[in-house]
Amino acid sequence: MQIIFKIFTIILLTIITGIANAKTNKLTIGLDWFINPDHAPLIIAQKRNFFKDVGLEVEMIEPADPNDPPKLVAAGKLDLAISYQPQLHIQVDQGLPVVRVGTLVSVPLNSLVVLKDGPIKSIADLKGKKVGFSVGGFEEALLSGMLQKYNLQMTDVELININFSLSPSLIAKKVDAVIGAFRNFELNQMDIVKRPGRAFYPEEHGVPSYEELIYIANVKNRNNPVFNKFFKAIQKATLTIINDPKSTWKDFSTYRKGLDDELNKRAFKDTLPRFTLRPQAHDLNTYKDFGYFLKEKGIIKKIIKVETFAKP
């Protein structure tokens, strides 16, 4: 009888332990920016319990500085971070131990923006002007590629770090142009305050297409099975947004105070067609082509095999 009781106890403890372990996996993700419609799949997955359904507890952390999240991933202080493909190439070239494990937006959002009624009518007009930026290295890479098409160098412009203050700095004429303005956000922001902007798109001015927003992890965690659960929830959330933009906008806008405004409403609508429907898939050639571009422009020192830093 005692043997049966002991066996029963062991089985019961095993079941209880298994349930406890299966309850939740905690995941911390550093955002690239303050919460905005670019993060809609994460917000919807959170609000509709898609993360919870796959056994995840996800904490989203907004950065004090948009340059910080990749460094925190490299240091093992974040599980994931939202970053940018161009920035990833540069960081890997510098030896940062990070790898792309998924994609949020697979097409460019970034743009070079000036005031529509201002003196800058062409990229060639930027010579001797001030250009604001927020993310070092990455945005300089895009700007460099755009300038070179018009026989200009980075030394022909004055770069000013304006952190999150892109549109305000441009409107206040603290700078003549900003690189890093998202075409789905800053252009709407400027239009709302009746100071419309003119955008120059990198992919139309000498820069190869690239994935704007990606998920990165530490190379040591590139095959973490928890990420598969995360992307399963993200994919479900993305499809839900595409299929039901009206109710998902309501969920997004009520996630916290300050999101339910005209700017976010416009940006939400403009961002919908840009979310990738298969977050773990990616085009190898997109990474190869962009790597060659950066090497040609002297922004990275060497070509690194894509498979080492971009998990297919």
Task: Locate the predicted segments by residue.
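Bacterial N-terminal signal peptides
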Residues: 7-16
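Sec/Tat signal peptide C-region and signal peptidase I cleavage site
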Residues: 18-22
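Secondary-structure end/capping motifs
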Residues: 223-299
